[in-house]
């Protein structure tokens, strides 16, 4: 009888028990070693996780205890960033890092592809992943990953001969064990054979047929698979798979190949839209109708409607619903522009600004409206513009009957009737109806004047002030 073991390594000594025979196998990697191994696979300084460099600093790499302690403090500060993060955020980082460490290998690999901000986002992502896999991808217990027990019981114990004994592990020659723990039943003695492919065979006439029971969930799933791979088969190419999760991964490659047939997808400047079209958006926001591919993205989006903004800038007091928004905003104060154009060397604060700029070098055709010929740099702006021609104004105000094409416009309009001013200045407590009005007001306290005249160098707080000033130069040139 041959049993396919899959990826199970060589077996440990065989022990005889009252119920049957038990083979216990220890994994060659501990849980901590697996966690360190999966911290990240980046090769560059920026790609390597800061927590990994903090955890793996060795005393031999330093000149003494003082330098070792100093380097640990610096690495910990770079990782946790106490100057920008609160105590709750630092605690969440530590919990999230430990949570990723105790997860199984395949789940760790998937989670590290997405830059999640909190443990709650990771839990939502895993729950969403379980729904996508249809319940077939069972989560493995980390304790079971350390030990995999195989119980082999005889189906006919009454026929067992008293002379049958277990051959000790030391009796097997070393070269034979290296080939796969080769053991067989000869002259009434049990010898278990494992070839190089990981198969276990039992032979010999005195030995009775044996039943195999697997306690590990991984082995349960392997033995429960059909002999012929007919249940998990690709509907397009007919390729068969042992596990349903492998079939889902394979079918996702087909979805990426099938791009949306909409007209906006034909533009070469819309690779982001093509990625969106490769997957369905099954999670919809009940407030504004916006749909998302993952439930974690929906939870993050709903913070906007709830008004929850836990991340605050220490420089100007501006608050954000997401940590990524705060980090992006901090570049305004620091002047950091990390996105570099390889063609002209110009730097940008945001990646979207770099992508928009690179269209100048690539000479990509902008998104053009077929009705009026107006061009836009982004497909989203074109979609909003096309609603003007289609007269699609499905959102109506119950107070005055005015209609709007976007839900966000209707929400802003409602504040006129209700008098709601949700955006408050943290310095003087003055409230505003629009966030843009608050941003203009904060510049008064910060004495910030971002709009500068290219001719005389005079700066202004608002764009309208710059336009009025430029008219003055224009009149002088005409005179």
From Swiss-Prot:
Sequence segments annotated as region (Disordered): 155-187
GO MF entries: DNA-binding transcription factor activity, RNA polymerase II-specific; RNA polymerase II cis-regulatory region sequence-specific DNA binding; zinc ion binding
Cross-link (Glycyl lysine isopeptide (Lys-Gly) (interchain with G-Cter in SUMO2)) at residue(s): 17
Regions of compositional bias (Basic and acidic residues) in chain numbering: 174-187
Zinc finger feature spans (C2H2-type): 232-254, 283-305, 311-333, 339-361, 367-389, 395-417, 423-445, 451-473
Domain of life of the organism encoding this protein: Eukaryota
Residue ranges annotated for the SCAN box domain, each copy included: 51-133
Keywords in alphabetical order: Isopeptide bond, Metal-binding, Nucleus, Repeat, Transcription, Transcription regulation, Ubl conjugation, Zinc, Zinc-finger
GO terms (BP aspect): regulation of transcription by RNA polymerase II
GO cellular component: nucleus
Protein localization: Nucleus
Functional description taken from the UniProt entry: May be involved in transcriptional regulation.
Protein name, entry field: Zinc finger and SCAN domain-containing protein 26
Upper lineage: Eukaryota, Metazoa, Chordata, Craniata, Vertebrata
């Amino acid at each position: 009888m041959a049993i396919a073991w899959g990826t199970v390594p060589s077996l440990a000594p065989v022990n005889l028990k009252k119920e049957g025979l038990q083979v216990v196998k220890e994994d060659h990697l501990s849980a901590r070693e697996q966690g360190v191994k999966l911290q990240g696979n980046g090769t560059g300084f920026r790609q390597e996780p800061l927590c990994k460099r903090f955890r793996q600093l060795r005393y031999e790499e330093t000149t003494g205890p003082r330098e070792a302690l100093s380097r640990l403090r610096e690495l910990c500060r770079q990782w946790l960033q106490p100057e920008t993060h609160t105590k709750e955020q630092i605690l969440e980082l530590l919990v999230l890092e430990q949570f990723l460490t105790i997860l199984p290998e395949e789940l760790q690999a998937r989670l590290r592809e997405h830059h999640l901000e909190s443990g709650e986002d990771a839990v939502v992502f895993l729950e969403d992943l379980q729904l996508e896999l249809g319940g077939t991808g069972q989560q493995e217990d980390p304790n079971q990953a350390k030990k995999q027990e195989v119980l082999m019981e005889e189906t006919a114990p009454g026929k067992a001969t008293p002379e049958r004994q277990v051959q000790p592990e030391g009796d097997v020659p070393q070269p034979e064990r290296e080939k796969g723990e080769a053991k067989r039943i000869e002259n009434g003695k049990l010898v278990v054979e494992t070839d190089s492919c990981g198969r276990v065979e039992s032979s010999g006439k005195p030995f009775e047929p044996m039943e195999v029971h697997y306690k590990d969930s991984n082995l349960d799933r392997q033995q429960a698979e059909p002999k012929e791979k007919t249940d998990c088969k690709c509907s397009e190419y007919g390729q068969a798979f042992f596990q349903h999760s492998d079939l889902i991964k394979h079918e996702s490659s087909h979805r990426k190949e099938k791009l949306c047939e909409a007209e906006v997808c034909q533009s070469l400047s819309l690779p982001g839209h093509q990625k969106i079209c490769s997957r369905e958006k099954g999670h919809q926001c009940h407030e504004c109708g916006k749909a998302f591919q993952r439930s974690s993205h929906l939870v993050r989006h709903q913070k906007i409607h709830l008004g929850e903004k836990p991340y605050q800038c220490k420089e100007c007091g501006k608050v954000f619903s997401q940590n990524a928004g705060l980090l992006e905003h901090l570049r305004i104060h620091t002047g950091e522009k990390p996105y570099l154009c390889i063609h002209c060397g110009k730097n940008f604060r945001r990646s979207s600004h770099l992508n928009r700029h690179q269209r100048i070098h690539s000479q990509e055709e902008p998104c053009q409206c077929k009705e009026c010929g107006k061009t836009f740099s982004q497909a989203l702006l074109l979609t909003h513009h096309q609603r003007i021609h289609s007269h699609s104004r499905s959102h109506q105000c119950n107070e005055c009957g005015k209609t709007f094409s976007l839900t966000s416009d209707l929400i802003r309009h409602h504040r006129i009737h209700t008098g709601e001013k949700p955006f408050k200045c943290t310095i003087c407590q003055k409230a505003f109806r629009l966030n843009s009005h608050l941003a203009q007001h904060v510049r008064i306290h910060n004495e910030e004047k971002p709009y500068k005249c290219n001719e005389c160098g005079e700066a202004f707080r608002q764009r309208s002030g710059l336009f009025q000033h430029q008219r003055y130069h224009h009149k002088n040139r005409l005179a």
